[in-house]
Swiss-Prot record:
Subunit architecture: Component of the Mediator complex.
Molecular functions per Gene Ontology: transcription coregulator activity
Region (Disordered), start-end ranges: 1-21, 127-160
Superkingdom per UniProt: Eukaryota
InterPro entries according to UniProt: Med31_sf (IPR038089), Mediator_Med31 (IPR008831)
Keywords assigned: Activator, Nucleus, Transcription, Transcription regulation
Protein name from the UniProt record: Mediator of RNA polymerase II transcription subunit 31
Organism placement in taxonomy: Eukaryota, Fungi, Dikarya, Ascomycota, Saccharomycotina
Length: 160
């Protein structure tokens, strides 16, 4: 597994000249792998439970990863819904909610539904949901800030 670079410990594997510059391809691969891991609600829940989503340094790193939205980088993404999650992680309300197992499952169900019926699904993280998070960010107690609606009648949960 690839070693992840930090400010204190850059990755130098694969550098032929022995310099302290991180190997760009290794960094690219590590950041690609990490940003795509954000498409996994169970991993998001893990991050929340282990307080990573409360760390200013980690939140700053998430902001840095916004460059993946640029087409020259986004073309490498296999799981483009990770970009929706990257946007949602900007909101404290979402960061609090994702620690709840039912909310993580709801997000997983939403991703699954969008995958099997892309033309019918309201993708979690759409403009209405984001506007709701902006208004309610840090103002509502956990569990009371995202409305759920069953739109298709077969038990799949959709965001209202």
């Amino acid at each position: 597994m690839a070693e992840v670079a930090t400010a204190e410990k850059p990755v130098t594997d694969g550098i032929q000249d022995g310099s302290e510059q991180p190997d760009r391809s290794l960094r690219f691969e590590a950041e690609l792998e990490f940003v795509q891991s954000l498409a996994n609600p169970q991993y998001l829940s893990y991050l929340a439970h282990n307080k990573y989503l409360e760390s200013p340094e980690f939140l700053n790193y998430l902001s840095y990863l916004e460059y993946w939205r640029e087409p020259k980088y986004a073309r490498f993404l296999v799981y483009p819904n990770c970009l929706h999650v990257l946007k949602l992680l900007q909101y404290a309300t979402f960061r609090k909610e994702i620690s709840r197992p039912d909310f993580a499952k709801q997000l997983m169900d939403e991703f699954y539904y969008a995958w099997i019926k892309p033309s019918e699904a309201g993708v979690f993280g759409d403009d209405d949901t984001l506007e709701g998070l902006k208004r309610e960010d840090s103002q509502a107690p956990p569990g009371q800030n995202v409305k759920m609606e069953n739109k298709d009648g077969d038990g799949d949960v959709q965001m209202a």
